[in-house]
Amino acid sequence: MKDMGKKITGALGLLAATTLVAGTVVAPEGVSAQQQDQVPPAAPALEWDPNDPRIGLGAGWLDAESAISGMELLAAIPRPDGFFNPSTPADGRFSNTDLAFQDGLLIQGNYNGFQIYDISNPADPTLSVSVVCPGGQGDVSVYGDLIVMSAQETRGRLDCGVEGVADSISAERMRGVRIFDVSDMNNPTQVAAIQSCRGSHTHTIVTDPADTENIYVYIQGTSRVRPGDELPGCSGGGPEDPETALFRIEVVKVPLANPSAAEIVNMPRIFADEQGNLAGLWQGGNHGPGTQSSRLTNQCHDITAYPGIGLAGGACSGNGILLDISDPVNPTRVAEVSDPNFAYWHSATFNNDGDVVVFTDEWGGGSAPRCRATDPATWGANAIFRIGEDGQMELAGYYKLPVPQTETENCVAHNGSIIPVPGRDIMAQAWYQGGVSLMDFTDPENPFEIAFFDRGPLSIESLFTGGYWSVYWFNGRLYGAEISRGIDVFRLTPSEHLSAAEIAAAESVMINEFNAQLQPKVEWAPS
């Protein structure tokens, strides 16, 4: 890898980029976006450095050109056999999804199951075991001897079989969360399969400091409601139907001593208003001339729990919300915001102090090019909110990838985590084929990029879904889950934006486990 201003050409370079496109940045002042009845100014146009080395990178699958600044690529591990289609590398049935970490292990989720890698030497990850278990998305979390995995597709089977389910109604179908016993990491065993009406697009492990015998799993379902003939009690009715499977999440209680007894213990109506209307938040549609059309709030895409502050951030289609999780079985909404620049609220990340939260907008669903020159700087971006002493959120600024991407690169804000640099708020983030971007939001009104890595598109002729699903910091290194290419490992390097001492302080923070949706509170040892 070479530093900013230079590119690297892949050894097999099959395709060459032809068109320079433009990108984004900036935290505009005066855009007060959280009030639903407010008509904001027009979204600002994109701004970028025309000399940015990410512009014009050559295309390819494993041989694309790349550009890097403030980081060093230590390892690039292709997806193993059984987790990609050699004839169609972008085959979505084998996409890499989210990551989880425990000690010297990395768990890589995939639409076709999951893999466990030994990362005791981060520069040389080695595959320990693969578990084939189709059903998508395959997002994973780890806690002690348990791995939890989301399943939402109708092809998912209770027995993890690869043959799928042909019948429209079947007792063999699995849509919900799977729990695997990994006390023997070389022989993961499914011990529970908790069915839910909409399946599990994502899930969140929630812990209770006062309860060491159980963990809780919040199920976020975004797919269609399955028939009641397949799972009794499932209804796809509107908010007037008290039994509807919409407008809720599910809470699963998992006894650590007997995880096979895991069960749904609550289905809280976290969008209800004071009158009990289940559809109490954003009703869907645009916010006025020149604004986004935001989805109806009847689901959460992601919930990030931060037990250290007793809150969770919910990215819930048409709203961003805060939940009081002091009682994990009964989360209650304490704040909500909407934003006329957001199409679909996707994920949330708190700063370490818990007084700022970053929400992402997955405009285009993650499969569309949304980082082009013609795309507004506040659409498909991060919105950064201060959390006041009263617990309410106030918009501070926006951040979007500050570089243009092409028409054949799916690109929008996606998953990331905090890098624990003392005294600063820094987030590493995936932008699909926009690559990796490190955002400094210590001043929430003026966020800016401090490091990046990007590859050229998979193709300059056609748009194939690829790029980074997630990028997370774990014990001194950054790990990126690349949808179509595999796993990348980075270390930070000193730059004008980040000193060697700051990097060393971040690298000194060691934790046993990391799930991005269960955010830990970091404390640094006295220097």
Predicted regions: what is each one?
Residues 3-31:
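Secretory targeting and sorting signals
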Residues 1-3, 118:
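Short intrinsically disordered, low-complexity coil segments enriched in acidic
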Residues 34-527:
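Feature marking well-ordered beta-strand scaffolds used for ligand recognition
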